[in-house]
Amino acid sequence: MLLMVCVRLCLLSFLGGVLAHPFVPGPAARPHSLDRASKKREYSTTGCSSEKEVAITAPTKNIFQSLTDREYVQVTEFLHQQKELNLTAVVNSTSWDNVIVTLDLLQPNKTDALTYLEGYGPVPARYARATLQFNSQLQPYIQEYVVGPLPIKNGLTRYEELNYIFTSGHGRTKVYNADGEAIATFNLKVGTEIKDITKRLLNGTATGADDDNLLIAGSDPLIHSGDRIYQWNEFYSAHSGEFFSETILPSSLQFKVDITGRDPSKWEVVGWYYDGQYWPTTAAFRKGVKTLTRRPGPNLDGSWTSTDQQGGKLPRDQLYPPISVQPDGPRFGVDREQNYIEWMDFSFFISNHKETGLQLHDIRYKGERLIYEFGLQEALAHYASQDPLHASSAYLDTSYGIGTSQWNLVDGFDCPSHATYLNTTFYISETTHVHPNSICLFEYDAGYPIQRHLTSTYVSATKNIVFTVRSVSTVGNYDYLFEYSFHYDGSITVTVRASGYIQGAFWSGDGDYGFHIHDNLSGSMHDHVINFKLDLDIKGRKNSLLKTEFVPISQVYPWSDGQSINTMKVNRSYISNEDDSKITWAKNGVAAYAVVNKDKLNKFGEAPGYHIFPNSGSTAHLTVQSSSALGQSANWANHNLYALQHHDTEPKSAYAFNSHDPHHPAVDFAKFFNGESLDQEDIVLYFNLGMHHLPNTADLPNTVTTTAVSSMMIAPQNYFPGDLSRRTIHQARLTYNEKSIVTDKKTFGTKQPTCAYDMNKSAPDLSTFVGEIEIPKFPWNPSGSLQTNPGG
């Protein structure tokens, strides 16, 4: 049995030479043509629609998307030519070699970008951001470099350390798990030494043998105590069927390892835990096992972990459910080369990145910029438990890769069958990976009107059509659905939904940390906190943060005959500086916040802006205060909303490798706050989505997206002269007389399709699922592309 089957708990990553994938390897890789990597449906023009994609041309280059294939090759070769770096090709490397971890575009400075986007300057010079890991020493470390300008030119291109975007002052992070394979081997050695006990307690073994039925997974992040490095590990039952359910099959048997240094002969087991009891040594554990009065046994796989249909079928469920169609074809345009999209009067660019996945840029309405940048920064899952492994677990998911975890979307299920699909590409370990059809674009009818009103003589209603950009990232046991939606009224929502297997803990009779949800399974409590950056530019870069608050008052009015009237009023104030901008949502939702421009009042004297507020589901910040596991690595998680003055030296609230040294992170969000003014400055918002998740029986086998959802909306506030949704023709007004007979019907030019619709167009295409396409970059082999299963 493979040690690291589908369990994100395992800290071993590609940095240590072992990649913990949420899937077993697929079949042997086969040659693949990129020609069919992106799904573009086209049908005959008979019937309602040709479904032909609307191709458009972006007004400018997409200066935000990652490196081109040629740039990846050039930068890789350039770095290998720098003898002082002493790099080894990844395909030939060991855990003691220096390697290239990843390459991406170093995002342009905002001033340079806006100068180009507004037509006043040249395209910003392109620079690569190179993440290198130096393993050829006793203390391995990651160092970020900047390489450029691109393309590579002899005598012009240079490389240097990338330090200015890190609050620590340097882009260097110590790595304590570089010897991932050695750690895995050590843990299997421990499993072998106590296999007599695991057979007795768990009826299984984890020794590295083919007939193992247990596996071992470790806590993340590693535990730093003084100058020592520790990790808790737990034995899990291996799945016995088709479903990778290990994270709900804990055994409670855990051991703590001191893995300080790089010499495995000096590593040692320094503690054992089982079913609420602790022993400081293996000898004490062996002795204590003999006197155990309770031996509950492990959680075992079975039909309860299956996600297939089971149980009695629902009434009338044999009938095909409603579906959405686009009878006249897509109503949005796409420039695939530039990843540029237009829908109604919205336009924007998208980019995709290994750590953070989908990002939106230069979002405009009728050509006027609303948002410079909008995208995920980090996703945290922080656990709590009476057992040491879960008490030590706080996952920062960009370290695993939100972008690397975006896979082919399931047509008709992840997205409507009429959706348009885009590919994503990223670079890791000297190979580019193409994930076909991993972003989808589509319109849908929300099923309720965006506007409606009825009177004694008429009723009016307007369709609520929404345009959505969606991706799904499977990070270990959890699947995150990320989507950005655009609305007729000029508002934008970002939504995160979660599904997949929970990470359960062993039930030892204590309900303080979760419900008892299966035989020996506790629904281990945890917080999901998902951080986003939102850089609004309201009629320019100079903005302020307005707070409006409903407050109860008792007031005497000229008309109240001297009596106090108990009522309420609105208080307006501005958040004047960064130190006052760490915001927790007000009780009862009485306070609201908006980015406004005080220098460009509308004709009524009000400051135009966009306000931000929770939309659906729950929002959350971290419950734990001064987390022992996180140290200073996730200070962005402590409140709901933040406002900061923009600086090119502070491009992100988080860093993908903060979890390697959480008490000394390269990016400490708390250091962004230094009292700077927020009065008519270039303001950047950071906000958190998420939920406090206390899993119950409804989370088995998988959590469902109906309850695991969090959403934020930004909407115009005194920005436009009225409701923008009045511009759509897809509305109706019915006038009726005193006898309630309709005398007039206004449909404002809407033409109802009357053609026959071919239902085959709406049938999900489930035969084209592609895992990923890998293209080696060093040595460069453009004809050596391979198609593999996800994680294969």
Please describe what each predicted stretch is:
Residues 1-24, 29:
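Fungal secretory targeting signals
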Residues 21-217, 224-225, 236-491, 501-510, ...:
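Extended effector regions of multi-domain proteins
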